[in-house]
A protein has these predicted regions:
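Short, small-residue-biased leader/transition segments that mark boundaries at the very start
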Residues: 1-6
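Short coil/turn linking the two alpha-helices of tandem helical-hairpin repeats
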Residues: 152-153, 159, 202, 224-230
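Short, well-structured active-site flanking segments
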Residues: 23-25, 152-164, 234-235
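Membrane-proximal, proline-rich intrinsically disordered regions
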Residues: 19-67, 238
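Bacterial N-terminal signal peptides
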Residues: 7-16
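Conserved, well-structured interaction surfaces
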Residues: 39, 43, 51-52, 57, ...
């Protein structure tokens, strides 16, 4: 009767709500640790460090128009005017909104995370010399310094992450670290390492950092610490 049908439905619903465990299996056995055990695989991880830099920083008009628009950093070849002239010169004709900064913020920490992964796994690939290994790690450390430099200079205290996130370290209530601490513990050490190990490069080297780029950025970062009340690094800026 209807009573039996109702009882069966209640029993089925109760059984459906019963908790169960799920044992996951990765048939491909793909992990970043495994990827990093070959040189090609590790350099794929290095390439990922550049993604947010191209997508949200210097390969996109949004971030540069907010931070560098209406300055003398932008012009056009032979002063040729285009539809973007007023955009870059006066930020006119744009429709700025919070999407600009939201995308940039997420991209920044995507880049930081990629750099942290590459740095942490730097001992895995079978490079023949430590010079080769450190040159690649130096790319990731240079980029991490650039990400944090921009984050600190635009937003002040931000969350400082220097290790890959794991299930144990994941938090939904991150804390902020003051700018000077980030300079001392991340930006300056990363740029010193990059200055030591990045290759000199040639005039054709335009898409990857070189020793000259690292030295220039190190000097800039050292000078910027003066804004936070420190004179400790001014001589290092002159020597870089």
């Amino acid at each position: 009767g209807l009573g039996d049908v109702y009882k069966r439905q209640v029993l089925f619903s109760a059984l459906s709500l019963h908790s169960c465990t799920l044992e996951e299996y990765n048939p491909g056995a793909f992990t970043k640790e495994a990827l990093a055990t070959s040189i090609d695989g590790y350099e794929t991880l290095i390439n990922q460090c550049y993604f947010a830099m191209e997508r949200f920083y210097y390969g996109s008009a949004d971030w540069m128009s907010l931070t560098e628009g209406d300055t003398d950093l932008w012009t056009y070849k032979a002063n040729e005017s285009t539809s973007y002239t007023q955009w870059f010169w006066f930020f006119a004709g744009t429709s700025p909104n919070t999407t600009y900064t939201n995308n940039w913020w997420n991209g920044t920490y995507d880049g930081v995370g990629a750099c942290n992964e590459a740095i942490a796994l730097g001992d895995k690939p079978p490079y023949t010399t430590e010079e080769e290994r450190n040159a690649k790690i130096a790319e990731a450390r240079f980029l991490r310094a650039v990400y944090y430099f921009n984050a600190v200079e635009q937003f002040g205290a931000v969350t400082m992450l220097t290790e890959p996130i794991t299930a144990e370290t994941l938090t939904y209530s991150p804390t902020r670290t003051d700018p000077m601490t980030i300079y001392q513990e991340v930006i300056l050490p990363d740029l010193r390492f990059a200055s030591e190990w990045l290759p000199t490069g040639t005039h054709a080297t335009t898409t990857t950092p070189t020793k000259k780029a690292a030295l220039g950025f190190l000097a800039k970062a050292c000078l910027q610490t003066y804004e936070y009340g420190s004179t400790e690094y001014l001589q290092e800026a002159l020597d870089a």
